[in-house]
Amino acid sequence: MPKIKTVRGAAKRFKKTASGGFKRKQSHLRHILTKKTTKRKRHLRHKSMVAKADQVLVVACLPYV
């Protein structure tokens, strides 16, 4: 049986935590930032966790993580 390929885009976006979850970066922080408040941008800088409903999809993209 052949090896399963890792989705490289997903490997760059998600990191597995010690408890088995996945951490991710928040979106909306690349461009069009002048209309967003400093508080909003500051909160978007922090990492977030992948939701349980989406975790199955992330695991399918990262078979060896």
Swiss-Prot record:
GO molecular function: structural constituent of ribosome
Region (Disordered): 1-26
Pfam families: Ribosomal_L35p (PF01632)
Keyword Ribosomal protein: yes
Source organism of this protein record: Mannheimia succiniciproducens (strain KCTC 0769BP / MBEL55E)
A GO CC annotation given for this chain: cytosolic large ribosomal subunit
Keyword flag Ribonucleoprotein: yes
Gene3D superfamilies: 4.10.410.60
Record family assignment: Belongs to the bacterial ribosomal protein bL35 family.
Protein name stated in the entry: Large ribosomal subunit protein bL35
Keywords, ordered alphabetically: Ribonucleoprotein, Ribosomal protein
GO biological process: translation
Compositionally biased spans, kind Basic residues: 10-26
NCBIfam families: rpmI_bact (TIGR00001)
Matches recorded under PANTHER family: 54S RIBOSOMAL PROTEIN BL35M, LARGE RIBOSOMAL SUBUNIT PROTEIN BL35M
InterPro entries: Ribosomal_bL35 (IPR001706), Ribosomal_bL35-like (IPR021137), Ribosomal_bL35_CS (IPR018265), Ribosomal_bL35_sf (IPR037229)
